């Protein structure tokens, strides 16, 4: 490929540490360098990459070029209007360190703060508040994009001439162009603490009923589910940002209600035995985690990191799955197919697939993104070791049940669904392709994910 940028060949994987492929990684510092690269790129040869936190391979391009956008990391807070302008390579971690002390919070945050702005838009990430406030793209005001010809576009959701391209880009997994900058709305806060209600449930039925009942009462809601427990017991945590009166009542050790200091507690070792996570160890962990949670507690004040990003407390926690790596199976189905939550957990138990991180959330209304994942209903995410015998066959069977119910899988977590499953479960695919073809007529952008899904 002709490029004015030095390139370094690297082996890349997603966060699941599976399906490594080699690509030439380039790290531009200016827009014109990206534009030059795109103008001279052959078809199906380029994809962008942030911090590599997608679990599968959407930020890989075997034998092609991967654009590392880490140098596009500027952050500009507009306190008067409550908005943020940021480069696509700016991480949510870096943004939080700027906005929380200033009295603002992200409109949506996924389960890790080590995601870039570009990645959050490309995957249209969701959080614990989707049932109330939608996904990240719902709060984006503008996106600056370089298309497949290297031309710059300013995309906004409400402009009739750019709206379709905007929504194709949000959730489009980097396949409509290179996101270089975005402006999005923030939410005001008066403290950096979360007022949290916690409740334990001994079975899945009552847990899910409580989640439905709380849809209108809590801004944030998430449940941890014991995947190895037959009735599906779990711990439900719900809450909202604490106000100043609540902060004063807790006799805080800090004099600053907006104090924010996220810290990693340790680092997982680089080499762990492949059998460390098994049914026995996960069962023991799940028992301890369930018993550790209070039966019922209201109004506990928690810091941002333990509530929103608990796994960020251990650097490189993905290493605990050993050299074979892991995958996350995350689906969404309508409320009418809520029984698939239990059926999925049962199928994983049957083949002995241990998941110590199994998360259940509620989704609200979908947005206009044709490839955006959320839709009204239930979303279950289960992390499982990739080497479990029979796992792929079981997931193929679950795929069909999800598709039959009108559901779909999350592209940012996917590492194995078929092209047929994808086409069947994303009804907006053809509309997305039309917008993609307008922005990238030579089909310069491609990833290992898009190759597998034949898009």
Describe each region flagged by the PLM.
Residues 1-455:
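Noncatalytic alpha-helical scaffold of FAD-dependent oxidoreductases
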């Amino acid at each position: 490929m002709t490029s004015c940028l030095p390139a370094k060949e690297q082996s890349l994987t997603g966060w699941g540490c599976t399906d490594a492929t080699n690509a030439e990684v380039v790290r531009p510092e200016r827009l014109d360098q990206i534009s030059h690269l795109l103008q001279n790129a052959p078809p199906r040869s380029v994809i962008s990459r942030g911090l590599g936190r997608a679990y599968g391979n959407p930020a890989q391009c075997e034998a092609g070029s991967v654009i590392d956008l880490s140098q596009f990391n500027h952050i500009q807070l507009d306190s008067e209007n409550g908005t943020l302008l940021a480069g696509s390579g700016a991480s949510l971690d870096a943004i939080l360190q700027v906005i929380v002390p200033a009295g603002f919070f992200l409109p949506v945050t996924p389960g890790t703060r080590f995601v870039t702005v570009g990645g959050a838009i490309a995957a249209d990430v969701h959080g614990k508040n989707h049932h109330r406030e939608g996904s990240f793209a719902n709060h984006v005001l503008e996106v600056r994009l370089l298309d497949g010809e290297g031309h710059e576009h300013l995309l906004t959701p409400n402009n009739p001439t750019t709206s379709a391209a905007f929504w194709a880009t949000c959730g489009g997994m980097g396949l409509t162009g290179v996101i270089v900058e975005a402006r999005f709305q923030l939410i005001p806060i008066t403290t950096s603490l979360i007022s949290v209600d916690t409740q334990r449930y001994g079975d899945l039925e009552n847990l899910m009923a409580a989640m439905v009942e709380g849809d209108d009462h809590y801004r944030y809601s998430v449940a941890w589910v014991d995947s190895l427990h037959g009735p599906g017991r779990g711990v439900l945590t719900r809450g909202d940002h604490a106000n100043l009166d609540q902060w004063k009542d807790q006799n805080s050790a800090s004099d600053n209600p907006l104090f924010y200091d996220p810290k990693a507690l340790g680092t997982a070792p680089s080499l762990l035995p492949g059998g460390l996570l098994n049914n026995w160890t996960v069962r023991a962990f799940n028992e301890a985690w369930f018993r550790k949670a209070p039966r019922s507690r209201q109004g506990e004040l928690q810091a941002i990191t333990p509530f929103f990003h608990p796994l960020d407390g251990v650097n490189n926690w993905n290493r605990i799955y050993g050299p074979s790596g892991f995958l996350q199976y995350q689906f969404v189905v309508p409320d009418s197919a809520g029984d698939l939550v239990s059926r999925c957990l049962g199928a994983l138990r049957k083949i002995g697939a241990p998941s110590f991180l199994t998360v259940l959330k509620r989704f609200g209304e979908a947005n206009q993104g044709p490839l955006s994942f959320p839709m009204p209903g239930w979303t279950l995410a289960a992390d499982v070791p990739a080497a479990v015998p029979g796992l792929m066959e079981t997931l193929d069977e679950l795929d069909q049940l999800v598709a039959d119910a009108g559901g779909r899988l999350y592209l940012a977590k996917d590492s194995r669904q078929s092209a047929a499953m994808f086409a069947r479960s994303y009804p907006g695919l053809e509309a997305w392709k039309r917008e993609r073809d307008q922005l990238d007529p030579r089909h310069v952008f491609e990833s290992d994910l898009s190759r597998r899904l034949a898009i």
